[in-house]
Structure formats: structure tokens, C-alpha cells
Amino acid sequence: MPPKNKEKGKKSGAQKKKKNWGADVVAESRHRLVVLEKELLRDHLALRRDEARRAKASEDQLRQRLQGVEAELEGARSEGKAIYAEMSRQCHALQEDMQTRSKQLEEEVKGLRGQLEACQREAAAAREEAEQALGERDQALAQLRAHMADMEAKYEEILHDSLDRLLAKLRAIKQQWDGAALRLHARHKEQQRQFGLTPPGSLRPPAPSL
């Protein structure tokens, strides 16, 4: 094989290696993107479950306390009515005591309701933060996808540019090789003519290979 063909084989192998390297980089980037999406989705779902569980537990606890206080208030009122009916002499004192107790219980109920509303506001704020985190994740994924698309375009541009340069070099080498073959053929033909020989048909110039 001529030296030029050996050089052509080496360059072709280097070109294939460079193309495979670019494909490996793109595949690895896509794999990392998929892993990142799964991790972010898992973290987001875990956060939402924890927040919902805490909010539900707080709401149930406050509701139970509220029901207990309301039951106690109703029992106190019923007890006051029974005492008033049975003990008229202590009616006024018991009324004052029950009214005071009722006010205290009502204040406690009011405070518990305020705590319940605060808990609901905190749950709403937690949901808003989770939605914001999800939006930031989507934005980060969009930026990563755009970066990957830009990388793919650059790799494709580099590959095409390398192929164009390689083809240009091969064309230049072919022209040099064809010119040398033609000159060698003409020289052999002239030498045979000098010795009175007829050039055989096998000494025709080589046909172009590109």
C-alpha cells in the first residue's frame, strides 16, 4: 500500500474515535439529566407528603381540642341549668361562676380557632414554597436542556468542520498522487519509445478514486 493510503487510514480511524467521543458525551449528559429529574421529583414528593402529614396532624389535634372544649362548655351550661333548677338559693352565685367559666372557655375556643387558622396559613405558605421550588426546578431543567442542545450543535459543527478539512486534505493529496502517477507513466512511455518498445495497455494512468 502507498504511504498516502496509510495516512488516510490513520485519519479515518481518528475521525471515528472523535465522533464516538462526541456521542458518548451527549449520552452521558442525557443520562445525568434523567437522574436529576428523578431526584428532584422524589424530593418534591417527599416534601409535599411531609407537609401534608404535619398539617393534617395539627388540624386533627386542634379540632379534637376544640370539640373537647365545646363539649365541656355545653356540659357546664347544662350543669348550670340543673343547679339553677334544683338550688334556687345559690342561683346567682352559680350563674356568676358559670358565666365566668363560659367566658374563659370561649376565650380558649377563640384562641384555639386562631391557632387553627395560623396552622392553615402555614400550610398554604408551605404549599406555595413547594410550588416555587417546583418552578425553580423546571427552570433549571429548561436551562440544562438548552445547554445540552447548544453542546450538541457545537459538537455537530466541530464534526462537520473536521470532515470538511479532512476531505479537502484528501482531495489535495489525490491531486498530488494523480499528478505523480501521470508523470511516472509519461516517463515510462518515453523510455519505452526510446528503446523502440510499444507501451502496453496496462500502463495507462490510474483512474480517479475519489
UniProtKB/Swiss-Prot annotation:
One of its GO terms (molecular function) is identical protein binding. Residues 7-20 have a biased composition (Basic residues). Residues 1-23, 188-210 are annotated as: Disordered. Keywords: Cell projection, Cilium, Coiled coil, Cytoplasm, Cytoskeleton, Flagellum. Residues 49-161 form a coiled coil. It is found in: Cytoplasm, Cytoskeleton, Flagellum axoneme. The keyword Cytoplasm applies. One of its GO terms (cellular component) is motile cilium. Its main location: cytoplasm. Belongs to the DRC12 family. Component of the nexin-dynein regulatory complex (N-DRC). Component of the nexin-dynein regulatory complex (N-DRC), a key regulator of ciliary/flagellar motility which maintains the alignment and integrity of the distal axoneme and regulates microtubule sliding in motile axonemes. This is Dynein regulatory complex protein 12.
